[in-house]
Amino acid sequence: TVSIFGENGLSVSAALGRKAADFMETDLSPAPSCGRLFDMSAMGMLYRDELMRHVPYGVSDCAILSSDPMISAFINDCMRTTSNERALTLRINRRGTSLSAYTEKTGVVPFVKLIAICGMYELESGRDISVPYDSPAFLDDLARSYGRTAYRYLSAPSDGSDNVARRLAARQFWSRDALFTAAKLTCILEEKNMTFPELYSLLPPLFVYSTTAQLELPPDYLDEFEGENFSFGRDGANGFVLVEKRGKTHISPLGNGRFRLTAQSFDEETARELCAEAQAFISSGAK
């Protein structure tokens, strides 16, 4: 799988993605017909310099781990971690796209809640936030509670409808890059002079559960669905949303017959139940 990203690390338009895919499927050309070769190793230094601008000088009581030893060495070197006590452990996945936090008091805190913590800091500071289109709906509720807006950008836009969200996201690396999320989180802890459990306790209680499933019919088929005990309909360009008393479930088409279910509720068991019920509902074809 090849992922294509454009300016500021954001996903490219559907048209450009198709053009790049077509290019990669062409036959190999002899060396004389190729253009100039460029040494891209300097890109790593540019990334490092940008990350260094976002981290505090020396992070204490924090261990940052990754299943990729290169990521682990890189981020620890940039953030100059100084403690072996590991009051807070941050773990980055192999692709650098997700982050979790762990303390004895909080247990494991998933990436979406760390994004919410960073977003809450921005909102408290009087700034809007921008997140990927399939981010949980509670980020919109959180933004509204501060009188601000949570903009969303599409994964493969066909027009400029998400330009405002993309311009904002270009300055908020923490919303999509786990290394920058780790840096942002430690900066917030240092600025507020708080422990992670204290900071985490400020977040409104909410559990988010996400899974993917297969849909044999086109996504537009969901437009015809109706429910008796809940509301169901389109959520702008982001997919569909199913709302009932226990919580919300967002349904986002991913292409190739797959879709993502993201449920939010006040406890884990209910969120899992909402996902399972939504999957059964759309698979049944009931109207």
Where do the PLM segments sit?
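Conserved phosphate-donor
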Residues: 91
